[in-house]
UniProtKB/Swiss-Prot annotation:
Its main location: cytoplasm. It comes from the Bacteria. Monomer. This is Phosphoglycerate kinase. GO terms for cellular component: cytosol. Pathway: Carbohydrate degradation; glycolysis; pyruvate from D-glyceraldehyde 3-phosphate: step 2/5.
Amino acid sequence: MTVLKMTDLDLQGKRVLIREDLNVPIKDGVVSSDARILASLPTIRLALEKGAAVMVCSHLGRPTEGEFSAENSLKPVAEYLSKALGRDVPLVADYLDGVDVKAGDIVLFENVRFNKGEKKNADELAQKYAALCDVFVMDAFGTAHRAEGSTHGVAKYAKVAAAGPLLAAELEALGKALGAPAQPMAAIVAGSKVSTKLDVLNSLSAICDQLIVGGGIANTFLAAAGHKVGKSLYEPDLLDTARAIAAKVSVPLPTDVVVAKEFAESATATVKLIADVADDDMILDIGPQTAAHFAELLKSSGTILWNGPVGVFEFDQFGEGTKTLAKAIAESKAFSIAGGGDTLAAIDKYGVADQISYISTGGGAFLEFVEGKVLPAVEMLEQRARA
């Protein structure tokens, strides 16, 4: 994968537009989870150190396109960046016809989704973005799977289009995990539905030695193997699909589980052998016996890809399975890569971030890359590099 990299460019005195993924949760006008902003800071700082006039853009939430919405404003992000960088980061609302920014200074553009044509990747809008800069830097891996004005269109029309350090690191880490993984390889794929992760499961079944499933996905595999899952979430129409995947790769199934009679923070957790699951039970986590077995599989792996917690870890009584696996990944000598929104929240909760080789900031983009799909924004950077 050959792309031009921002780190190789002379940015002194250049107007540089950086597309970051600053789509962070905001609560009461304040950033409530800063992981994506923290991930973007090294790129922004590097551009400033290189003497560029820096313009940063991002989306936030899903506003009605072309309309301002206070709840989707990047104002709290501008305030956060000002504190983090120790300098004023003005939020610029009207920028499409030009913006005044000096070398060594930085501005943040208001939410790109307030611009008509952003999501449809309109040429006219993309050309306006491109006219603002000498160099466009795509650094938002989390939106690289979307062909939009500020991710794909601008890369097509900018004088120079390059990958930022964060995007380049994501591509390198994923390439290492999927292209030539150290053996044996284990993957954890968890979520509510097999249907939403079917392509991921099929793709990983071709390269994994152990495919550990969790959540509603595991319930479907358990039901496919003839086990009772009570009133747990599962997909009865995908039992044959689960069996077909299990025929291609080792899918170790839980031997014990944590169940409850209701899905609630106050629910009482009970550990049961899988054979003892009652008709009115909901499976909300893997049991300690299963967690210990899965942990051993992970500790002996050469590569680990982790997407999704294996239980309802938001409720502590159903979080022990995810906690045990998180600690096992942290203690493993394997090259480990983790991605997907809930996965990042679990990593935060159990304090293992520093012991995971690479944490992907992309949710949908991470999954599409794992599926083997082409990411439009990356493909455009490759085309520009070839040209």
